[in-house]
Amino acid sequence: MNQSLLSEFGDPLARVEAALAALRAGRGVLVADDEDRENEGDLIFAAQTMTNEQMAMMIRECSGIVCLCLTDERVRQLALPMMVEANSSHYQTAFTVTIEAAQGVTTGVSAADRITTIRAAIADGAKPSDLHRPGHVFPLRARTGGVLTRRGHTEATVDLMQLAGLKPFGVLCELTKEDGSMARLPDLVAFGRLHQMPVLTIEDLVQYRQLLSERSA
């Protein structure tokens, strides 16, 4: 990862701290993964604070595949089956069946409807009957152990929410360029600068979590 591009956002630990502060304040963050992995950047918001306006931005600026990152416990609570039994995707991205709120939505595809669906899924007493299947929100099951067990955007999202003291659920979508191609690190930096969003990498988060583990040992 080209650290010089990220230098304006501080060192790795400072970048994570800035992201946590932004999430606590209800703002978005941008997370890049390794250049030898997907080499993509995701726009991420906390599920519990995400607004209709933020969802509209995500739909407008990103790929359109809006994903709700959930813990394994929440996936079980909602009785969400995995999208396929045998996952043959390259990075084993753990999609469940897609969802829609059972109440309060129309077609399910608008920004407001997707927020309604997300709120139904993350409610404290959420139950399977609160959701219809399929729908326009794509849940992802995070692996237990977070980025220390899998260096994916799903795990990074849940880790960030937990470290920020928020509900362990986040919303992500891959940032794209105007021509529809995937945004790379220079594009993330420019987008973060324009929208005053922190930019960090999954490697930053791995280092941060490892440091916390060492301090508590």
Curated annotation (Swiss-Prot):
EC assignment: 4.1.99.12
Site note Essential for catalytic activity, residues: 136, 174
One of the record's GO cellular component terms: cytosol
Keywords assigned: Lyase, Magnesium, Manganese, Metal-binding, Riboflavin biosynthesis
Cofactor note: Binds 2 divalent metal cations per subunit. Magnesium or manganese.
Gene Ontology molecular functions: 3,4-dihydroxy-2-butanone-4-phosphate synthase activity; magnesium ion binding; manganese ion binding
Cofactor names: Mg(2+); Mn(2+)
GO annotation (BP), single: riboflavin biosynthetic process
Pathway(s): Cofactor biosynthesis; riboflavin biosynthesis; 2-hydroxy-3-oxobutyl phosphate from D-ribulose 5-phosphate: step 1/1
Pfam families in the record: DHBP_synthase
Binding residue positions for Mg(2+) 1: 38
Positions with a binding annotation for Mg(2+) 2: 38, 153
Lineage top rank: taxon: Bacteria
Catalytic activity: D-ribulose 5-phosphate = (2S)-2-hydroxy-3-oxobutyl phosphate + formate + H(+)
Residues that hold D-ribulose 5-phosphate according to the record: 37-38, 42, 150-154, 174
Family: Belongs to the DHBP synthase family.
Subunit structure: Homodimer.
Protein task: Catalyzes the conversion of D-ribulose 5-phosphate to formate and 3,4-dihydroxy-2-butanone 4-phosphate.
Protein name, entry field: 3,4-dihydroxy-2-butanone 4-phosphate synthase
Species assigned in the record: Aeromonas salmonicida (strain A449)
Gene: ribB
